[in-house]
């Protein structure tokens, strides 16, 4: 289903938080939504890989990389792992790489910027902890909705049937 964050903001204005417009879309899917799983890490993607090995249907991985864009936290290998395990999308408060391939994969990916340098693979960080960036606090189990216009957050699953009316 295509997500329209503008329409969701109009319908659910009192139930959503809007993330500051600092993200760009780098995946092959322009809109996605799901229940948040968070990873907090810095220039290391080993923990990200561990989480992406889990079943991801209905889930979006939200990565707090501290806003650092010196090393890419997501590359084609991790994006393919996410796709293989059914993840709906990935949002990275940090960088990604290998855009030529990322944009062909059937998964939503939003991040701050691209850079060719990869992250190390240490499993350092935290999983399912509240993270704050873009002017909002993301709690595990919240729902995130993303499209080319922006990213919004809700503590509850929104009724997307409202978009079809």
UniProtKB/Swiss-Prot annotation:
This is Regulator of ribonuclease activity A. The keyword Cytoplasm applies. Homotrimer. Binds to both RNA-binding sites in the C-terminal region of Rne and to RhlB. Globally modulates RNA abundance by binding to RNase E (Rne) and regulating its endonucleolytic activity. Can modulate Rne action in a substrate-dependent manner by altering the composition of the degradosome. Modulates RNA-binding and helicase activities of the degradosome. GO terms for cellular component: cytoplasm. It comes from the Bacteria. It is found in: Cytoplasm. One of its GO terms (molecular function) is enzyme binding. Keywords: Cytoplasm. Belongs to the RraA family. One of its GO terms (biological process) is regulation of RNA metabolic process. It comes from Actinobacillus pleuropneumoniae serotype 7 (strain AP76). The keyword RNA-binding does not apply.
């Amino acid at each position: 289903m295509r997500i329209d964050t503008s329409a969701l903001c109009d319908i659910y204005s009192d139930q959503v938080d809007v993330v500051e417009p600092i993200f760009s879309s780098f995946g092959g899917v322009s809109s996605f939504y799901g229940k948040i799983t968070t990873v907090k890490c810095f220039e290391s993607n080993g923990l990200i890989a561990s989480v992406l090995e889990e079943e991801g249907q209905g889930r979006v991985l939200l990565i707090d990389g501290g806003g650092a864009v010196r090393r890419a936290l997501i590359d084609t290998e991790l994006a393919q792992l996410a796709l293989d395990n059914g993840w709906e999308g990935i949002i990275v408060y940090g960088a990604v790489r290998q855009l030529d391939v990322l944009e062909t994969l059937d998964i939503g990916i939003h991040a701050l910027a691209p850079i060719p340098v990869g992250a190390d693979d240490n499993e350092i960080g935290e999983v399912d902890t509240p993270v704050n960036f873009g002017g909002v606090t993301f709690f595990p189990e919240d729902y995130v909705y993303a499209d080319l216009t922006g990213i919004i957050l809700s503590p509850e699953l929104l009724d997307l049937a409202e978009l079809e009316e």
